[in-house]
């Protein structure tokens, strides 16, 4: 195990601590709810859903967080402005945990950010994300909200190397006019969750994971990813699982451990239904990391899985 010379920044988002030296704080886990095709949704555009089933899923994630000591975030996805506002209203009432405001639509993301600001949920809200594709209207609208936390996505298709990812955060790498960190700061963001933007196997997945070391060495900011998307894009596994279904969850949940072992502070582990698999697996990795880091001067916090599960 390793310890960074750079002082590590620990964010406090509504009482949830994200960051620190490997082995110090437990990995924060985020499960996605209301994603495209989610069975609990009755109308994706209008945001009509089964509230009992949604509550049960969030409470299960909450329960697993209590059991293992790994804090949780509710990754709240919405296809439209109308839908995401309804989802956030529900999530805000049903749990005290932080939540991601997530959508493929910039208009929906902003609607979510504005809603969170209007009703006093801004301290729990994390924007997903400030990235190279964000246009001026979205950034200006984000600036006018009260949000202070955001994922900053290190995706650089022009240069998917470690240097290219660092560059897109730092100065735009010649692809955009300014670095993503400066763009985020201009929007009032001062709590950066650095997403290394993991791409498919053979197309930079390993490089993205290695970027985790670079981020924490250079800035000390919390780092993580939605690394579970890698198995989803693996053609061989998609074919193999047709006859061997048991292989899929092993790779899906297991991918998160790779991000953890590279110094990751948070993982977006995929569908919230996977909470009962993801939390024990990630807690186990945290125990390994904490035990290994103890000999080099890193002490785990009191509610770490190392103390809760041993």
UniProtKB/Swiss-Prot annotation:
Keywords: Methanogenesis, Methyltransferase, One-carbon metabolism, Transferase, Translocase. GO terms for molecular function: tetrahydromethanopterin S-methyltransferase activity. GO terms for biological process: methanogenesis, from carbon dioxide; methylation; one-carbon metabolic process. The keyword Transferase applies. It catalyses: 5-methyl-5,6,7,8-tetrahydromethanopterin + coenzyme M + 2 Na(+)(in) = 5,6,7,8-tetrahydromethanopterin + methyl-coenzyme M + 2 Na(+)(out). Induction: The last gene of the probable mtrEDCBAFGH operon. Its EC number is 7.2.1.4. InterPro entries: Dihydropteroate_synth-like_sf, MeTrfase_MtrH/MtxH, MtrH. Pathway: One-carbon metabolism; methanogenesis from CO(2); methyl-coenzyme M from 5,10-methylene-5,6,7,8-tetrahydromethanopterin: step 2/2. It is an enzyme of class 7 (translocase). GO terms for cellular component: methyltransferase complex. Belongs to the MtrH family. Part of a complex that catalyzes the formation of methyl-coenzyme M and tetrahydromethanopterin from coenzyme M and methyl-tetrahydromethanopterin. This is an energy-conserving, sodium-ion translocating step. MtrH catalyzes the transfer of the methyl group from methyl-tetrahydromethanopterin to the corrinoid prosthetic group of MtrA. The complex is composed of 8 subunits; MtrA, MtrB, MtrC, MtrD, MtrE, MtrF, MtrG and MtrH. NCBIfam families: mtrH, PRK00979.1-1. This is Tetrahydromethanopterin S-methyltransferase subunit H. It comes from Methanothermobacter marburgensis (strain ATCC BAA-927 / DSM 2133 / JCM 14651 / NBRC 100331 / OCM 82 / Marburg).
